[in-house]
């Protein structure tokens, strides 16, 4: 087979250009990424050796070998893992299908330090090697395959694939280093980077180097060169070590390697269980949200091992989806090594591990919540996701309610439900909340005025998830939740009914509102729960449906709503006496537009609003 030339997909070209010219704030991470890829290849081979009958007799000792040539300025990373065939090379090193490149490019912020930290999270770590290499040669042979292949590229838009000779399965990557990055072809540089990022990769990493010694003295001194190969990492599964052997620094360094994240985690939970079930878990709560946290196809951050043998990192059932930001490891002593994904989903052992793990993680989040300042660091990125648990995790619902924080009418900061309940007024029977599209509009809602008169606080819920989960939350600590916009809640305020004589007094004016706004509203009502506002657009049934549709990602169709009027307001009292139909119509539309502004924060037809306003002002002056 002669050399076949291929062109990188457009997005990969963009990525390579960024790698070469922009994302150079922390170049050494290229080695972390290549070692991590090698470790993944060894994990996959280990799993196949346990589950594939054809590979059960394979005699191999999994390891990673690093070597360099300082004269030629090359660095080589070699593993004896699963290897790749020609299709794998094209798919993984040339196209966007498995690279996550598109997501990476869309997440870039322009901050070189932050952007370089994203590399590993998006599965584009291989390309980071072009930060230091002017040319890369990959030689690889897939396990149980007779043919090996070479992949060559200088990162300038094209790559070549050809057949080559390679005895053992696995992958060997040789980097031809740029002059300014030739220091990576040195024993001490490689040793330092591996110890910093890959100390607890669960496979031995060997470094081959030439050791130079001098014997004799003066003219008789001789230089003796000896090639040596030394293991430079602990190769121990950190989660299997005793807590007493580990320092905070060890946990944090392992996280940065494991999660491909340069930032430190907020917290970690290391737990070993012995008894009827034996397993170890190590979970991390990150300080930043994963890029795909709100995507349907998010990647699980938890790896499952059985007796230190990697099983999967693609099972979203290991933890509930509302904890999808958690990274870590579950290592079971009791699961069968050849467990399939279908068996995993029905396995009682794993179900018990999952249940206990959730409780451990929630307890750690509760511990974080004791310190308001630190809890803000957790709640800002992960609070919305945590709320999702109210919808499906009934077992931990009470615990989740304790952990949630809300804005309210009376407080300028996020508060807990416990704080809200501690400030309940003597006759207050419920916890009131108001749903809306954003916090500013909620704070301006005329509905809040009557609650304020009673001294009742109202929770202001503007997250999209709120409309989905809150109607299903019946109570907290025996106190019911109620939507502040619902008629039942307004009755609890003890408001007086609108008397018949008042309705008769406003009958003609209400008819004028209905005639002018017949294409906009479904009706007009007099309301006793408005204080300073003249009018309010309200329709609790349609509002609930709209909130649900937004949460489900559907567009909300325009629907006619009820316009509520405040019969005690001076403006309406004066409109009762207005005999100029043209002027009355302008006032009616202005009041309706004002109510729309309070509801939406914007008007569909701002031009007409402005014309009506100018007309009224002109007559008033």
From Swiss-Prot:
Keyword set includes Cytoplasm: yes
Annotated compartments: Cytoplasm
Keyword Chaperone: yes
SUPFAM superfamilies: ATPase domain of HSP90 chaperone/DNA topoisomerase II/histidine kinase, HSP90 C-terminal domain, Ribosomal protein S5 domain 2-like
Location of region: B: 342-547
Keywords noted in UniProt: ATP-binding, Chaperone, Cytoplasm, Nucleotide-binding, Stress response
Recorded coiled-coil stretches: none
Pfam annotation, one family: HATPase_c_3
SMART domains according to UniProt: HATPase_c
Cellular component terms per the entry's GO annotation: cytosol
Chain positions covered by the region annotation C: 548-621
GO BP annotation list: DNA damage response; protein folding; response to heat
GO molecular function per UniProt: ATP binding; ATP hydrolysis activity; ATP-dependent protein folding chaperone; unfolded protein binding
Region (A): 1-341
Function: Molecular chaperone. Has ATPase activity.
NCBIfam families linked to this entry: PRK05218.1
Family from the record: Belongs to the heat shock protein 90 family.
PANTHER family in alphabetical order: HEAT SHOCK PROTEIN 90 FAMILY MEMBER
Quaternary structure note: Homodimer.
Name of protein: Chaperone protein HtpG
Record organism: Helicobacter pylori (strain ATCC 700392 / 26695)
Source species taxonomy: Bacteria, Pseudomonadati, Campylobacterota, Epsilonproteobacteria, Campylobacterales
Gene from which the chain derives: htpG
């Amino acid at each position: 087979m002669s050399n076949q030339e291929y062109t990188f997909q457009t997005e990969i070209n963009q990525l390579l250009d960024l790698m070469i010219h922009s994302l150079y704030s922390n170049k050494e991470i290229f080695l972390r990424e290549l070692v991590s890829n090698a470790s993944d290849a060894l994990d996959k081979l280990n799993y196949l050796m346990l589950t594939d009958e054809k590979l059960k007799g394979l005699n191999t000792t999994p390891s990673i070998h690093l070597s360099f040539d300082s004269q030629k300025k090359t660095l080589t990373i070699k593993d004896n893992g699963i290897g790749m065939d020609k299709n794998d090379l094209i798919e993984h090193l040339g196209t966007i299908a498995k690279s996550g490149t598109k997501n990476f490019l869309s997440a870039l912020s322009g901050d070189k330090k932050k952007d370089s930290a994203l590399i590993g999270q998006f599965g584009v770590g291989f390309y980071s090697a072009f930060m230091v290499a002017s040319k890369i040669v990959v030689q690889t042979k897939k396990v149980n395959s007779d043919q090996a292949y070479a992949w060559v590229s200088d990162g300038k838009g094209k790559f070549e694939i050809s057949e080559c000779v390679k005895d053992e399965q696995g992958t060997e990557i040789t980097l031809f280093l740029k002059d300014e990055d030739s220091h990576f072809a040195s024993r001490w540089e490689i040793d330092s980077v591996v110890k910093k990022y890959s100390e607890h990769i669960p496979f031995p990493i060997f470094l081959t180097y030439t050791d130079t010694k001098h014997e004799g003295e003066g003219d008789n001194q001789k230089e003796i060169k000896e090639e040596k190969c030394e293991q430079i990492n602990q190769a121990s599964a950190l989660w299997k070590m005793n807590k007493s052997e580990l320092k905070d620094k060890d946990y944090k360094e392992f996280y940065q390697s494991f999660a491909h994240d340069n930032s430190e985690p907020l917290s970690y939970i290391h737990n070993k269980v012995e008894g009827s079930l034996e397993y170890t878990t190590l979970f991390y709560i990150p300080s930043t949200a994963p890029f795909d946290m709100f995507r349907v196809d998010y990647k699980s951050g938890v790896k499952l091992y059985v007796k230190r043998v990697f099983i999967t990192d693609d099972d979203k059932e290991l933890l509930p989806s509302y904890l999808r930001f958690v990274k870590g490891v579950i290592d079971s002593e009791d699961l069968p090594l050849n467990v399939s994904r279908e068996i995993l989903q029905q396995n009682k052992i794993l179900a018990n591990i999952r249940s206990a793990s959730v409780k451990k993680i929630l307890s750690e989040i509760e511990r974080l919540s004791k310190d308001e300042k630190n809890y803000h660091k957790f709640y800002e990125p992960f609070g919305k996701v945590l709320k999702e648990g109210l919808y499906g995790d009934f077992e931990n619902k009470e615990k989740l309610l304790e952990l949630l924080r809300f804005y309210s009418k009376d407080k300028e900061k996020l508060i807990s439900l416990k704080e809200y309940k501690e400030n309940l007024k003597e006759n207050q029977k419920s916890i009131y909340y108001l749903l809306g599209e954003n916090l500013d509009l909620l704070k301006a809602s005329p509905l809040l005025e009557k609650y304020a008169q009673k001294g009742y606080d109202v929770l202001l819920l503007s997250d999209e998830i709120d409309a989905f989960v809150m109607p299903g939350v019946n109570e907290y600590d025996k106190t019911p939740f109620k939507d502040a916009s619902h008629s039942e809640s307004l009755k609890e305020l003890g408001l007086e009914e609108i008397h018949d004589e008042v309705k008769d007094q406003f009958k003609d004016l209400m008819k004028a509102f209905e005639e002018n706004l017949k294409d906009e509203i479904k009706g007009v009502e007099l309301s006793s729960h408005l204080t300073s506002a003249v009018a309010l657009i309200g329709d609790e049934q349609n509002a609930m449906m709209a909130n649900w549709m937004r949460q489900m990602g559907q567009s909300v169709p325009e629907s006619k709503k009820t316009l509520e009027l405040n019969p005690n307001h001076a403006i309406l009292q004066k409109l009762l006496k207005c005999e100029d139909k043209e002027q009355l119509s302008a006032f009616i539309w202005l009041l309706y537009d004002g109510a729309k502004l309070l509801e939406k924060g914007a008007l569909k037809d701002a031009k007409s609003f402005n014309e009506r306003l100018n007309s009224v002002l002109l007559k008033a002056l």
